[in-house]
Amino acid sequence: MAHSKHGLKEEMTMKYHMEGCVNGHKFVITGEGIGYPFKGKQTINLCVIEGGPLPFSEDILSAGFKYGDRIFTEYPQDIVDYFKNSCPAGYTWGRSFLFEDGAVCICNVDITVSVKENCIYHKSIFNGMNFPADGPVMKKMTTNWEASCEKIMPVPKQGILKGDVSMYLLLKDGGRYRCQFDTVYKAKSVPSKMPEWHFIQHKLLREDRSDAKNQKWQLTEHAIAFPSALA
């Protein structure tokens, strides 16, 4: 793959902006980071600039910043990389989150690449509702998302990919909190070639970096695409 063809380099900077509302609480988050598209690794630092401190677990937002920024996925040569091929125009993705206790979130994201700035811009809108007051999200009992594997399915007639994965938030008491992710990825330009169905394995870690003035945290992710060993 000719990296310059898609406006991507081995190392890219990222800038993030999210506006959202969870259980009626509005907030704005910004962030910056560094990622390695061809190694599938990235690290970002986020800060709540409006609406902080958040009255709910920030882990539910992590999946709006990551688990969809698929440019940073290590793809083998035998699988078409839909996400890098969409650059520099980029792509959009929309995701529904259905939690086991009936809570629901919707996240819509727009991703573009600035070749001049060597930067990937990530803008998102996040809305969540119906989180129980005594549940793990509102009581901030989550610690991180468990490593997982998303099935990626092409829809050639529409030029989109659909993602399906059952996710689990790890809890402080050792339990798990289940959430179903359904995602639609759509390139802004017409794809010249679609991939076959495949999987993306990913691991996301959050570390608190808050100070006396602002709620902050760091996210690191590693993502690798692979075909079925049995297909």
Curated annotation (Swiss-Prot):
Coiled coil: none
Source taxon at top rank: Eukaryota
Residues that bear Phenylalanine amide: 65
GO biological process: bioluminescence
Alphabetically ordered keywords of this record: Amidation, Chromophore, Luminescence, Photoprotein
Tissue distribution: Tentacle and oral disk.
PTM annotation (2,3-didehydrotyrosine): residues: 67
UniProt entry tagged with the keyword Manganese: no
Entry-linked InterPro entries: GFP, GFP-related
Residues the record marks as site: Cleavage: 65-66
Outcome, altering residue 66 to I/R/W/Y: Produces a non-fluorescent form
Cross-link (2-tetrahydro-2-pyridyl-5-imidazolinone (Lys-Gly)): 66-68
Summary of the protein's practical applications: Fluorescent proteins have become a useful and ubiquitous tool for making chimeric proteins, where they function as a fluorescent protein tag. Typically they tolerate N- and C-terminal fusion to a broad variety of proteins. They have been expressed in most known cell types and are used as a noninvasive fluorescent marker in living cells and organisms. They enable a wide range of applications where they have functioned as a cell lineage tracer, reporter of gene expression, or as a measure of protein-protein interactions.
Modifications made to the protein after synthesis: Contains a chromophore consisting of modified amino acid residues. The chromophore is formed by autocatalytic backbone condensation between Xaa-N and Gly-(N+2), and oxidation of Tyr-(N+1) to didehydrotyrosine. In addition, the residue N lysine undergoes cyclization. Maturation of the chromophore requires nothing other than molecular oxygen.
Record text on subunit structure and interactions: Homotetramer.
Family, similarity comment: Belongs to the GFP family.
Function: Pigment protein that is yellow in color.
UniProt protein name: GFP-like fluorescent chromoprotein FP538
Protein's organism: Zoanthus sp. (Green polyp)
